[in-house]
């Protein structure tokens, strides 16, 4: 999309939504709204609810900047609706969004494409309810998480056998499928991808030892180290496999790939976030800023990549 043509269009910043990450989405949306307004765009904030199609028609929206997190926002649902309404939108399309949101499906893709990812097993909620649990073959500790939630919602680190049942039940409150994943003992790192270009690698050091919902969104609870303290060879490899994961899932625009290293600093892809946070504490803007891209320019670049992904992205 050309800057001159989009300046005249009515742009919606779609935020809020119906997921458990609503609060974070509103923060992201407000930051994007401010950046685009300062750049001279005609922007309307739209809180996504069940009447979303009526709102888009009423406001005569011609382009959508997606600032949603979690279900119904980054899982392909909204993307499909915008495709039907022929409203160009930012970020990944229907299939890439759905695949990236489903941690189990995306890990199967990574495995097929030889992208390093921690070993894993899958449990069904029904198995837990009926106490039909097969024994896990992975050595402890393991990470237990719902297949389709973001912001570490429903995630537990299991150190002892007796913690496994409660952790599975907790994850089962959020999804019918549960992922049990090998725990990586190294560093937590993340790689932003902007238009097929990997951004600088960030190392995440939470004070609590676990980068949970509280650490993620509370100032001062986590230390971010840029560039990450890993060897140059591993650093470049982390960028390479992150870009490959982004491309394998068919992502477009912008995304953030989260990784863990083992004790030898080998990076493993955990998951791909097709709608990374864009708040003042968010990782992608930090990496972009380090690469010399100010926040307002980053937001504008994402907007200029807005398109319809079906029928050749017209």
Positions of the model-derived regions?
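ATP-binding N-terminal substructure of ATP-dependent carboxylate-amine bond-forming enzymes
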Residues: 1-101, 105, 124-132, 304-313
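Active-site nucleotide/adenylate-binding loops and adjacent lid/helix of ATP-dependent enzymes
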Residues: 2-15, 58, 99-181, 185-187
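Hydrophobic beta-strand scaffold residues
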Residues: 43, 88-89, 117, 142, ...
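Glycine-rich phosphate/pyrophosphate-binding beta-alpha loops
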Residues: 70, 207, 273-287
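Phosphate-binding site of ATP-dependent enzymes
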Residues: 159-240, 261-268
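Conserved metal-phosphate-binding beta-hairpin within the catalytic cores
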Residues: 182, 191, 246-278, 288
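Active-site "cap" helix and flanking loop/linker of ATP-utilizing ligase/carboxylase catalytic domains
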Residues: 203-255, 286-314
